[in-house]
């Protein structure tokens, strides 16, 4: 309520009580004012009531929620289902206009404020996470692959003769298809093996640039976050090469915001060389539903060019989700999650190393990968060709998600390109292995349960050879111990939620 309404309320209720209520309301308003004025993620989290007040205030600024609105156009923010309307907090118009995803909508002032604030808050988080000189970013309602495509299509207008993209190999389909979809020819640079790690072959990159001609290359497409034993590209050195040959540089930073090491690589690359844009996933870094990404860069004008390349208006759902999430966490809450992730990486590494020693395997030495780990499966691979993939199936049926097994000798054809040793980022990696990652929001309980189930599965797979024929059938059966373990895990979760509710109510 505004001031006059509060004054009028004093005729209905004791004025002292009304003044107290007005002060409570003012506290919410002060938080909103600080957010709008500063455009930064608040240090401390907001409670849900403040967030809902703010979103409702934004919604009533959109024309579809005007009390006397009369819409006669083809797109008037009409929604048939009340449930759908509530799901979106009645913010129906989306973001941007037909020519620019970052443009203001005249009949959706509230949604436009939401869009601008979200972009500003995400930029603040990117800077806090380590890329301090990033100048601009925007949330786009497409996942990482399509967002990379948008960057490549923008560069096409700057380099119309270019047809190649230099790409140090990473065995992940969407980043490869992003180049194909944009109409370019990927030039795959094989990684070099250094110890257990797969690292960028800088000499091969420079040789290809010389061979093809810099003017024929759209950009270098490098990667930070990835599955071990591949490690982040030598972004700093690649940035220097790009600056030397005046070639654009786009970085796939899919889940790198959560890693200070990945963010430092981007910051250093921009400092000593050239990075035009870096793209990161919303769901992997900000714990929201799949379907959004952040495109960021060091030049306001170039980032704006990318936003103008997006055709039509766009869904506001990813922007709304990340806005609510960052307000719920605050900068302090997000930093806490980043710190916990680092701690859990150390814990996961130590537990896998213990298990590897017990089972005569090895945790591969990949010190340059800050998120993913790899456990060798040498003895399992020697046992039989299908034993490695069988382990993956066993883990999945025991409700272990995210872990992936990489057998030897797998080939995959993507858009006519043949990748030998697919999933291992190399034609001939020396051993089969299993991946596990310490990503943001992972808990100690996740690690403990994973190690316990992995131990069981590996011991099953390593039974005497005369039992091997029965293993595929038996291994898939869920035992009473498995059921008891799942029940215990569910009980721990429910107990934790009950404790949280009691703390909140207290």
UniProtKB/Swiss-Prot annotation:
It is found in: Cytoplasm. GO terms for cellular component: cytoplasm. Residues 1-44 are annotated as: Tetramerization. Its EC number is 2.9.1.2. TRNA binds at residues 271, 398, 463. Keywords: Cytoplasm, Protein biosynthesis, Pyridoxal phosphate, RNA-binding, Selenium, Transferase, tRNA-binding. The record marks 74 as: May act as a substrate filter by repelling compounds with a negatively charged alpha-carboxylate. It is an enzyme of class 2 (transferase). It catalyses: O-phospho-L-seryl-tRNA(Sec) + selenophosphate + H2O = L-selenocysteinyl-tRNA(Sec) + 2 phosphate. Gene3D superfamilies: Type I PLP-dependent aspartate aminotransferase-like (Major domain). This is O-phosphoseryl-tRNA(Sec) selenium transferase. It comes from Xenopus tropicalis (Western clawed frog). The gene is sepsecs.
